[in-house]
Amino acid sequence: MKTNLSSQITLNRVSPRYYKPENAFEKSVLTRFEKIPTDIFESAEEGANQIAYEIAQTIKEKQKVGKFCVLALTGGNSPRNVYSELIRMHQQEKLSFRNVIVFNLYEYYPLAPDAVNSNFNALKEMFLDHVDIDKQNLFTPDGTIAKDTIFEYCKLYEQRIASFGGIDIALLGKIGRAHV
């Protein structure tokens, strides 16, 4: 049996009908066995634009009711196109991030958040430094704490997330070895 066929699957060999349903009925037929709703796009750019649009809509909905939008983000390479589109929306469409709170999904240990190789530093360079988010609304794990305090620190990090009502959207990265 062959495994790892994902590199051999191309959408130009598959009719769009099988991944781009024309109506709700077709979508229900295609997705009836899915446990997690999944959309397939013809390009990474098209997918990134849709994700950015959905994030922007959530931010705007929260703004309308005077609430924070809580995002959990990563500094990896996978969401780079999403961040680029959100920056474009901020610059050209005046999407504001003033009501956004960001929790960094992970950090390397032992590494300070401002270290050149830190996940948080990458997230700032790719995205956060280019939008109008309040720096007080940025949270990241401290990679410099003592090992014997990590468990307690993680509990406090989760409590901080809960204090803002939980996470509205988590944008995960995918590494080539199928890690998420």
Feature map (PLM): residue ranges:
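N-terminal glycine-/serine-/threonine-rich phosphate-binding loop
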Residues: 2-71
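Ligand-binding beta-strand-loop-alpha-helix segment within the catalytic cores
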Residues: 9, 19-35, 95-169
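Generic structural signal for well-ordered alpha-helical scaffold segments
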Residues: 52-60, 87, 91, 124-128, ...
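Short glycine-rich or small-residue beta-strand-to-loop segments that form or flank ligand, phosphate
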Residues: 70-74, 103-106
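Glycine-rich beta-strand-to-loop/alpha-helix junction loops that act as flexible
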Residues: 73-78, 174
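Conserved small/polar residues in nucleotide/adenosyl-binding loops
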Residues: 176-180
